[in-house]
């Protein structure tokens, strides 16, 4: 793994594909005026890169990479897996998350995937692999950026089944679960793993986000952090299988409590976080 950068990187997210190409050249001039030397690209381009299940199109991304490389910018290459393409949701609706109220979402927004969907995992890993293969020889790519701002929750059947697997691995026996969660309270004793359901508004958290059992709600959040981390590691390992010595990270969000960032940090080559500047900081 490379040990350091050749310079301190100064830049941010750059989405030239959202603008006419005649603007791109002007962008490069503005970057130089601002002493910007790096750009994070390809954060939300999955739909553009993979227009259908068995087709990749890197034409536009090639242009962006070449433009930045020719200007000697450091590139932080994202894997685009934070927002699903419409074709995937149409064919595989189970890739979408199910919300706190038990509603499976349709296509739209971002942070919209179920991390325990095997279909999502399959295509996210495949995309990360294809990106790494295509750009492995580009020396301007300094860091690989997996997904984007991991967060949110899903309460679908896939998550429920994997939660039970996670609990078995942690507690070994159903009696140990009952003891840890003090399920004698309100007559909640479990006798089989498949009696355990996800804690959402339809079950243990029916009163405005307050939980009947802190144990199950806390464990579900621990489980979900691990589920997201598994997705990160899946893509990270796919990139490193092609480019073993590259640096890989993802963007954490300050003191966000939804994920166990201490656990995540051990899996990251660089611990990085989002910095949203406002006018008072400029």
Feature locations, PLM:
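Structured loop/turn residues at beta-strand edges in well-structured enzyme cores
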Residues: 3, 7, 34, 139, ...
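Short, solvent-exposed turn/loop segments enriched in Gly/Ser/Thr/Pro and often Arg
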Residues: 15-17, 42-45, 78-87, 142-151, ...
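Aromatic-lined substrate-binding rim segments of carbohydrate-active enzymes
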Residues: 26-32, 41-102, 235-242
